[in-house]
């Protein structure tokens, strides 16, 4: 069942997890999401639970790429979840084309996105009271991740005490508050309450009930859940088209599209003055994609 553990042990586990950068995950069975009102606001009280496996951290970090281009979606888990940037065609595309420095718009579209996962006990859920007392998986973003870290990475020399918020006895409930600010969900007012034990946690039958509802988060990042580089490359090429070629090939493709656009822009009189030979080698048509909303909007946000 549950065991007490030191905050130093949790801090070390979280530091190891923090080495991974990037993604989001699609809808997951058993995931709890805060229901928002028509104004985009909502609140609940949850409790982060310890790991189901004593050797694993109580959190999981999953890195993904999710974007739409040329009318097609690319939504795949990224191998950088395990610190491997070479087995992801999107990461290679970003690196080879130096998108961070040369094309900020493209970089923002295809960059890695990170989702954090935990087992939680729903303490209070005003919008869905039927969830109260139940255990779910919960996906959250960096804002909440930073608040969890702030409870552990304290200044001991200044008299601050680190808190393992996942401890069933000495952890703390988390008040999740979401407010709509400038069209985005804002989590700034979310906070941890004072340390407290989960009610009835000393009852072994209650512990067992909670434990059996929890999932092994390490399975989410198991390498056998990730697609091969070849499979991902095929999908990436289908979505990106000529842009996936990168380098000189992509540049040539862009120039060809530019020529086609220029030809389309000729007026009829100019066209009539040209001979058939002038246009024998011309190509027509070009592809473009409009800006799309972030995939997190498609997945109803974090």
From Swiss-Prot:
Q: Name one GO biological process term.
A: DNA repair
Region described as Disordered: 273-302
Look up keyword Ribosomal protein and say if it applies.
no
Q: Which domain of life is it from?
A: Viruses
Tell me a Gene Ontology molecular-function term this record carries. metal ion binding
Q: Which Pfam families match?
A: gp32
Q: Does the keyword DNA repair apply?
A: yes
Tell me the segments the record calls region LAST.
3-7
* Residues that coordinate or bind Zn(2+): 65, 78, 88, 91
Q: Where is the composition biased (Acidic residues)?
A: 291-302
Q: Which UniProt keywords apply?
A: DNA damage, DNA repair, DNA replication, DNA-binding, Metal-binding, Repressor, Viral DNA replication, Zinc
Compositional bias annotation for Low complexity? 280-290
Instruction: Summarize the subunit comment.
Output: Homodimer in the absence of DNA, monomer when binding DNA. Interacts with the DNA helicase assembly protein; a ternary complex between the helicase assembly protein, the single-stranded DNA-binding protein and ssDNA is an obligatory intermediate in the helicase loading mechanism. Part of the replicase complex that includes the DNA polymerase, the polymerase clamp, the clamp loader complex, the single-stranded DNA binding protein, the primase, the DnaB-like SF4 replicative helicase and the helicase assembly factor. Interacts (via C-terminus) with the viral SF1 dDA helicase.
Domain notes for this protein? The acidic C-terminus is involved in modulating the ssDNA binding properties. The N-terminus LAST motif is involved in the cooperative binding of the protein to ssDNA.
Q: Which family does it belong to?
A: Belongs to the Tequatrovirus single-stranded DNA-binding protein family.
Role played:
Single-stranded DNA-binding protein that participates in viral DNA replication, recombination, and repair. Coats the lagging-strand ssDNA as the replication fork advances. Stimulates the activities of viral DNA polymerase and DnaB-like SF4 replicative helicase, probably via its interaction with the helicase assembly factor. Together with DnaB-like SF4 replicative helicase and the helicase assembly factor, promotes pairing of two homologous DNA molecules containing complementary single-stranded regions and mediates homologous DNA strand exchange. Also promotes the formation of joint molecules.
Query: Under which name does UniProt file this protein?
Result: Single-stranded DNA-binding protein
